Amino acid sequence: MASNSSNGTTTTKPPPMPSPLRNSKFFQSNMRILVTGGAGFIGSHLVDKLMQNEKNEVIVADNYFTGSKDNLKKWIGHPRFELIRHDVTEPLFVEVDQIYHLACPASPIFYKYNPVKTIKTNVIGTLNMLGLAKRVGARILLTSTSEVYGDPLVHPQTESYWGNVNPIGVRSCYDEGKRVAETLMFDYHRQHGIEIRIARIFNTYGPRMNIDDGRVVSNFIAQALRGEALTVQKPGTQTRSFCYVSDMVEGLMRLMEGDQTGPINIGNPGEFTMVELAETVKELIKPDVEIKMVENTPDDPRQRKPDISKAKEVLGWEPKVKLREGLPLMEEDFRLRLGVPKK
């Protein structure tokens, strides 16, 4: 960015205004849409929703580190759908109008297994997608995370809260990677006039979650169906809020189509302790299963709950599916994949 200096003061030129042609494309009926990480859990549900609009062409880029072609099998071969095996740490050259940038491992098991790859995906991957957005004049949405708030001292968390974070912890490759990704998004917006949207997504659950990915809802349901004890990490009073995947997808699409840059919290403000969640899974799925306390992992936040006032106000969005309604839908999917019939 150019700057001028006179009389000891420095002024910085404002970013260039996006061209009217760039803005006009976001109101056209035919859209070419790129979804990075589209073979993953949330990404594949987003693809399903986007493909319901017969005027959308959807391109998915995924390296299958945590995603699976099985999540997209009903669209493979469809004339409006294209699947590319691609790692976002390498540049991608496609012509698109919108970019949903979801690519990144979201489970502690996966991002602790390869922390360097995780932070490269967040930083270099986001740089590459911003470069693509700049080249083709696309609007880009980043799925950031509630993890940017760290172990919050403010509860519930609003978008204005800067967080209480550990930049060198075992989870930092993910948490700090997303914080850098948000920084890059706003820097490209200010310097190059890129149309950006940032969603801070909170814990999400539903069908197609990886069965053994280490996240608490999938852990509990898989353990219950296998007849294993539900392992609650001590002390069990730590809280999370759980958003059903269809609600999450609706929130992301409203943010993309709206005129708000964000960041905006997308999540369900219903708050549960880990013991309460385990008891709910036990009640709904396998009442005779044991609940067992185990040692906690490092850097586990004590509480997490979104303030969604902004999403309600500017997007007209709030979640509809309650936890007791969503868990049986996820149970049905897990039963099929684990081969455990309902008795």
Swiss-Prot record:
GO CC annotation terms, alphabetical: cytoplasm; peroxisome; plasma membrane
CDD domains for the chain: UGD_SDR_e (cd05230)
Active site: 174 (proton acceptor)
Cofactor requirement: NAD(+)
Entry's Gene Ontology BP terms: D-xylose metabolic process; UDP-D-xylose biosynthetic process
Localization, UniProt: Cytoplasm
Chain residues that bind NAD(+): 62-87, 174-178, 215
Binding of substrate, residues: 171, 203, 216-220, 233-240, 300-304
Catalysed reactions, semicolon-separated: UDP-alpha-D-glucuronate + H(+) = UDP-alpha-D-xylose + CO2
UniProt pathway annotation: Nucleotide-sugar biosynthesis; UDP-alpha-D-xylose biosynthesis; UDP-alpha-D-xylose from UDP-alpha-D-glucuronate: step 1/1
EC number: 4.1.1.35
Residues recorded with modification N-acetylalanine: 2
Region (Disordered): 1-22
GO terms assigned for molecular function: NAD+ binding; UDP-glucuronate decarboxylase activity
InterPro entries: NAD(P)-bd_dom, NAD(P)-bd_dom_sf, UXS-like
SUPFAM superfamilies, per database record: NAD(P)-binding Rossmann-fold domains
Top-rank lineage group of the source organism: Eukaryota
Keywords attached to this entry: Acetylation, Cytoplasm, Decarboxylase, Lyase, NAD
Pfam families noted in UniProt: GDP_Man_Dehyd
Family: Belongs to the NAD(P)-dependent epimerase/dehydratase family. UDP-glucuronic acid decarboxylase subfamily.
Job description of the protein: Catalyzes the NAD-dependent decarboxylation of UDP-glucuronic acid to UDP-xylose. Necessary for the biosynthesis of the core tetrasaccharide in glycosaminoglycan biosynthesis.
Protein name (record): UDP-glucuronic acid decarboxylase 6
